[in-house]
Amino acid sequence: MTQISPTRLHSPLDRLLVEAQRALDTVFGNPPAERPNPAADTPDVVLDPEQRLHAAGLMRINHVGEVCAQGLYFGQAAVARDAHTRHHLLEAAQEETDHLAWCADRLHELDSRPSLFNPVWYAGSYALGALAGLRGDDWSLGFVVETERQVEAHLDEHLETLPQSDQRSRAILRVMKIDEARHADQAEQAGARPLPAPIPSAMALASKLMKTVAYRL
């Protein structure tokens, strides 16, 4: 990726180029993880065709979740008013990049692919993140908390429904769940505002739609 000098990041064009590069890397690239894959030392097993398709569908949902998280965090960081909030968001986004890479690796192992709608998921999440950020950093952090809590819930569901023998996927999801819980706790400590009741419900409905589509496509 082309590096842009920090002294030039005040230019609107430079900021636009950075955001465009982040979007391309997330949606079409394969950003490398900074941490080792949690499944690296877990033996793989041969799943039957039905188990493999189910595991791939769940891991595709998780991959989409990480694409959405990247879009949300980058959208929020782009309009964050406080440098500490921006740093918090970008730091969380880096850990989500690890998750993105691990899920992509597992999809490849399962002879599957990411969602065809990743550009749509990213664009929608980026717009939501930017809108939340424009309301203020406390709102932005509130969206982080709610997003991570909902992700934790669906990771628990996936850990319950994955084929019992698919320990490689389980190893990845367990570490992801720990990270998501920490992101939510850190956002709360940083001053997150609790979101009004209709917003979490709308987010859950959108998440349900995403999961239904991403499981197959």
From Swiss-Prot:
Record field: catalytic activity: a 5-methoxy-2-methyl-3-(all-trans-polyprenyl)benzene-1,4-diol + AH2 + O2 = a 3-demethylubiquinol + A + H2O
GO molecular function terms listed in the Swiss-Prot or TrEMBL record: 3-demethoxyubiquinol 3-hydroxylase activity; metal ion binding
One Gene Ontology cellular component: plasma membrane
Family note: Belongs to the COQ7 family.
Taxonomic source organism: Xanthomonas axonopodis pv. citri (strain 306)
Topology class, membrane: Peripheral membrane protein
Top-level taxon in the UniProt lineage: Bacteria
Binding-site positions, Fe cation 2: 96, 148, 180, 183
Cofactor: binding comment: Binds 2 iron ions per subunit.
Protein name: 3-demethoxyubiquinol 3-hydroxylase
Function: Catalyzes the hydroxylation of 2-nonaprenyl-3-methyl-6-methoxy-1,4-benzoquinol during ubiquinone biosynthesis.
Entries under SUPFAM superfamilies matching the protein: Ferritin-like
